Amino acid sequence: MSVRIEHDTFGEIEVPADKYWGAQTERSKRNFPVGKERMPIEVVYGFAQLKRAAALANFDLGKLSEAKKDAIVYACDQILSGELDEHFPLVVWQTGSGTQSNMNVNEVVSYVANMYLKDHHSDESIHPNDDVNKSQSSNDTFPTAMHVALYQEVETKLEPALKLLRNTLKEKEDKFDSIIKIGRTHLQDATPIKLGQEISGWRYMLDRCETMLSESKKHILNLAIGGTAVGTGINAHPEFGDKVAQYISENTGYPFVSSENKFHALTAHDEVVQLHGTLKALAGDLMKIANDVRWLASGPRAGLAEISIPENEPGSSIMPGKVNPTQCEMLTMVAVQVMGNDTVVGFASSQGNFELNVYKPVIMHNTLQSIYLLADGMETFNNNCAVGIEPIEENIDNYLNQSLMLVTALNPHIGYEKAAQIAKKAHKEGLTLKESAIQTGYVTEEQFEAWIKPEDMVDPH
């Protein structure tokens, strides 16, 4: 392997000649061969947005020459294009401030910027610390990049997937509004409900999650940049944080602002905890929806079989013809993983000892993973399951007509105890509810027909 020699304050080190990173990245790569979880590229892009904005701000404040500013902006734009992804090899499991990833970005930006300056016949050169990292610390850059990445992924991935599934459920809700089925509570028969009403509950869960997500993501717009090492802003111009937030906003289209309290921004990540709490709530709702769907589709001959779902692949390696609710199973596993991630994010956020939380990479990793899993899970579940949900009306009608809980409609006319006697007699003697009611003498056939109307029971008001 061809190498070149790079150096840092620890001395010289060999770096692969075809890679753009420098000495500190190479040391981290060697010192932390832990796991396979790479630092998400979206965090790198968040850093690139930040370094780009910092160069513009430092130029405005007289801290950086125009040539250096242009070179850094060019390098950051190259990173944002996705063409340099291979030059960011570090894993999540590194220093808790994310210093190695900050330096990885600084070194790659410096390398590309120097090539740019050389191509433009400039005598200037870019240093990863003195120029790319000017007015910054890893302690305020990593949380800034984290917030930029999280907000963007919620906006571009999670919310569209949530809306997609929500809209599909709304279509099913409206389509099945005339189908009356038996309701169930405690896994036991209950009073009737429309299939559309049942699905409306699922849909409204997603409506509420969409509202909560919209609210919680607002707090992610606060950026730590400008706090530098411990929140005091040492080595940064007083206007630096505001200017960087402004430039990031202009380039992303999102209204980021500089946090009003940098001490909080460095040592606490409660905004991310709140955001992930919303992700956990969404995961819980998706778990419920997926479980309901697979129970209602259970069968085909010895289950509930009130709805059918798409058959996407063989379900068993030994039982021919078996088809399983695989999309539901996928979504419930996604939900479990997100719930576990929430525990990690909550505990990690609590570890802000003194002026700095040093669990930032794992907070970032778990939150982004939850966003990706939920977004992909909802989209896949929607396209391969939800859109194909159809009622099996023969079974639905059969369960409804056999239900003893229709007796509830007699309560206002004959009282709870007599109605209970009718239901128990029907169950014990294998009678229909109508047969039992007439045999007890509590109601006539005409009264039963007038009072037991499922269509009235699902819309009593």
Swiss-Prot record:
Pathway: Carbohydrate metabolism; tricarboxylic acid cycle; (S)-malate from fumarate: step 1/1
Subcellular location: Cytoplasm
GO molecular function annotation: fumarate hydratase activity
Keywords from the named record: Cytoplasm, Lyase, Tricarboxylic acid cycle
One Pfam family this sequence matches: FumaraseC_C
Reactions catalysed, as given in the entry: (S)-malate = fumarate + H2O
Site-annotated residues for Important for catalytic activity: 329
Active site (record annotation): 186, 316
GO CC, any one term: cytoplasm
GO term, biological process aspect, one: fumarate metabolic process
Protein task: Involved in the TCA cycle. Catalyzes the stereospecific interconversion of fumarate to L-malate.
Family that this chain belongs to: Belongs to the class-II fumarase/aspartase family. Fumarase subfamily.
NCBIfam families: fumC_II, PRK12273.1
Additional information: There are 2 substrate-binding sites: the catalytic A site, and the non-catalytic B site that may play a role in the transfer of substrate or product between the active site and the solvent. Alternatively, the B site may bind allosteric effectors.
Quaternary state and interactors: Homotetramer.
Name assigned to this protein: Fumarate hydratase class II
Species in which this protein is naturally found: Staphylococcus aureus (strain MRSA252)
Gene name as annotated: fumC
